[in-house]
UniProtKB/Swiss-Prot annotation:
Keywords annotated in UniProt: Cell inner membrane, Cell membrane, Heme biosynthesis, Membrane, Transferase, Transmembrane, Transmembrane helix
Single GO molecular function: protoheme IX farnesyltransferase activity
Note: Carbon 2 of the heme B porphyrin ring is defined according to the Fischer nomenclature.
Lineage of source species: Bacteria, Pseudomonadati, Pseudomonadota, Betaproteobacteria, Burkholderiales
EC top class, as a word: transferase
Source superkingdom: Bacteria
Annotated protein name in UniProt: Protoheme IX farnesyltransferase
Source organism per UniProt: Bordetella petrii (strain ATCC BAA-461 / DSM 12804 / CCUG 43448)
Recorded topology in the membrane: Multi-pass membrane protein
Length: 297
């Protein structure tokens, strides 16, 4: 009995890794924040639960397909060489079945238990990431993460649509914030994984334009990010609590970017990459806290 259970557990763990759970968690978190910001009070619990489930399922399906498409590239990169698809321990048919099951279930949940708008927007995001970004943009242009970043920026709009049956300007402001955040986040990773990307033949910005050019653009995007994060306050979507948080977090982001530009090290690039994840989570948490503070005032 134990000998049979061990391989099954190992296979399930490999499936889970293909869905990139850490990345999925951040995306789903931003979607949930969008849900809570979409209404004056508390959103409908059913919409939150099933919206979260459906968005998570389709995100996981997209990441699994991404791993399948990039299996040969992943095999040449130290960071991704241990993925089951890169090692060939999971077949293409298994990955397609997994992605089809997750994606199909997600679409059914969103269509029948949330609303068709959220289903179609989430499906478009799936196509944008799994096909347009992975197949067309990533292997062809150093602007891959800039253009393709829209699909990764969509979660707040998906969450908003799940609760409000609409995607107003406020939701697109949140999308814009993540869209501007995405390039410096990924370029920091590409800097300290530069040799990996070069070995894999991917035209990431540090590979095609060099380290200093990339560091400059990280700094420029970090400044643009600080400006963009003031928009919720400017359009009266959020108040002073959010603005103070956004400026404090943005100041830390710019400080990291400035240090990286002045004096590069892999360790500092790694710290910026990790901080950028925390930054986005705290920024969206500040949006929610400010929203609730406004309701209680």
């Amino acid at each position: 009995m134990t000998s049979l259970a061990a391989p099954q557990t190992g296979l399930l763990r490999q499936y889970l890794v293909l869905t990139k759970p850490r990345v999925t968690q951040l995306a789903v978190f931003c979607a949930i924040i969008g849900m809570f910001l979409a209404v004056p009070g508390l959103p409908d619990p059913g919409r939150v639960v099933f919206g979260t489930l459906g968005i998570w399922l389709l995100a996981a399906a997209a990441f699994a397909i991404n791993c399948l498409i990039e299996q040969e590239i992943d095999a040449r990169m130290l960071r991704t060489a241990r993925r089951a698809t890169a090692r060939g321990t999971i077949s293409a048919a298994q990955v397609i079945s997994l992605s089809g099951l997750l994606g199909g279930a997600g679409m059914l949940v969103l269509y029948h238990l949330v609303n068709p708008l959220t289903m179609w927007l989430t499906f478009a995001t799936f196509v944008g990431y799994a096909i347009i970004y992975t197949v067309i943009l990533k292997p062809r242009t150093p602007q891959n993460i800039v253009i393709g970043g829209l699909s990764g920026a969509m979660p707040p709009a998906l969450g908003w649509a799940a609760v409000a049956d609409a995607v107003p300007a406020e939701a697109w402001v949140l999308v814009l914030i993540i869209f501007i955040w995405t390039p410096p986040h990924f370029w920091a990773l590409a800097l300290y994984r530069n040799h990996d990307y070069a070995k894999a033949g991917l035209p990431m910005l540090p590979v095609t334009h060099g380290q200093r050019f990339t560091r400059l653009h990280i700094l420029l995007y970090s400044l643009a990010l600080v400006a963009t994060t003031t928009l919720p306050y400017i359009i009266r979507m959020s108040g002073l609590l959010y603005l103070a948080s956004a400026l404090a977090l943005g100041g830390m982001f710019v400080a990291y970017a400035w240090r990286l530009y002045r004096e590069y090290s892999d360790a500092l690039a790694r710290r910026l990459f990790r901080f950028s994840i925390l930054y986005l989570a705290l920024l969206f948490a500040a949006l929610l806290m400010d929203h609730w503070a406004g309701l209680l005032a």
